[in-house]
Regions:
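Short beta-strand segments of immunoglobulin-like
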Residues: 30-34
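Beta-strand-rich extracellular modules
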Residues: 115-119
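Recognizes extended acidic, P/S/T-rich segments that occur
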Residues: 58-107
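Short amphipathic, basic-aromatic surface patches that mediate peripheral association
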Residues: 46-49
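Bacterial N-terminal signal peptides
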Residues: 1-8
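Proline/serine/threonine-rich low-complexity linkers at boundaries of modular beta-sandwich domains
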Residues: 15-25
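Structural beta-strand segments of beta-rich domains
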Residues: 39-43
């Protein structure tokens, strides 16, 4: 499975940084691409701001070179949730979005479009 993220395809709609950026405004940070499995792709997109938790990230994908983008589930918004499983894991989620594109075809190259918005 090959993943292709073209810089012009990853877009973030966020206010221009300046001295008076609202704490409610989302500021995109590092985008982490998880190692692909045979049929899934995973993403983590760290952010700053969005104190009102109303930002979102829409996800679309297509086979490399195909014309039509197909919608996937949006990334999940996380900020400060405790993730706990007995003695195996205990962490507080950072300010971020995370999610996956599921049920892909093995041996196929995909393009993924992530669009961040903050009303």
């Amino acid at each position: 499975l090959v993943i292709v993220l073209v810089p012009s395809v990853i877009t973030a709609q966020a206010p221009v940084q300046g001295p008076r950026v609202s704490p409610d405004a989302v500021l995109p940070g590092e985008l982490v691409i998880e190692p692909a499995t045979l049929i899934n792709l995973g993403f983590e997109w760290f952010i700053q701001g969005d104190a009102n938790l109303n930002a979102s990230v829409d996800v679309s994908f297509r086979e490399r070179g195909a014309g039509m983008w197909r919608p996937a589930l949006p990334l999940l918004r996380l900020q400060g949730e405790r993730i706990y499983a007995e003695s195996r894991i205990d962490l507080i989620a950072p300010n971020m979005f995370a999610g996956s594109v599921l049920d892909l075809e093995p041996g196929t190259a995909y393009e993924v479009q992530l669009t961040m918005a903050d009303p």
